[in-house]
């Protein structure tokens, strides 16, 4: 990221794990066009799940997963976006945030999920006030279908509409005009801190009846470069063809 961005900052912090251990964590903040006061934010989580608790094989449920889709897919798109921003300086300020420890929580316990975004939201500079934020999570599915996430609609309906209008304008049919189930993700702490942020996520990976989420099957062969390109294409249009 340092090869591309105008500035990169590491936000380091610690967390006490469920077994009392101290875990060292790091958020990464990359900024482009530092002089611009009109800014937008894109984010993803760069950690992966330390245990595959949803794996059909009980022997694998205490082992870490690769997280090719759940984690790496959003990061991959943002790394490529950073390269594009380096080659084509944006007309607006852009901040790319890579959050740590999104996936440390246990099922049905939200306390230890989204730790990186919670820390960032609690310690952000008063001057950090992007026009909107877009979170990428699980966007590499070969059967990509991104629906409107209910918490995004609740916190930032105008941003959801803007993104879906842009997707329709450019023929990105993977952005479906229906709602998904609500998701607790890194966009929640950001919205609670006043940063209007929506979550682009395809939780049905690959479908409702068979999910690789939080299992050892979340591997690169289940993901599609085409899906990554579709989401990346949307982001570039939002940056360079602005109307919000």
Indicate residue ranges for each PLM-predicted region:
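Surface-exposed patches in mature extracellular/periplasmic domains of secreted proteins
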Residues: 5-18, 89-94, 174-181
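Active-site-adjacent substrate-binding region
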Residues: 132, 141-244
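Structural recognition of the beta-strand scaffold that forms the well-ordered cores
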Residues: 9, 29-31, 39-43, 67, ...
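Sec-exported extracytoplasmic/periplasmic mature domains
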Residues: 2-6, 80-90, 122-126, 164-169, ...
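Solvent-exposed loop/turn segments at secondary-structure junctions
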Residues: 14-17, 34-36, 46-50, 101-105, ...
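A non-catalytic alpha/beta surface segment that caps or lines the substrate-entry region
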Residues: 1-35
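Glycine/charged-rich beta-loop-alpha catalytic/anionic-binding loops adjacent to active sites
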Residues: 53-64
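Acidic/histidine-rich catalytic neighborhood of metal-dependent amide-processing enzymes
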Residues: 62-158, 174, 182, 186
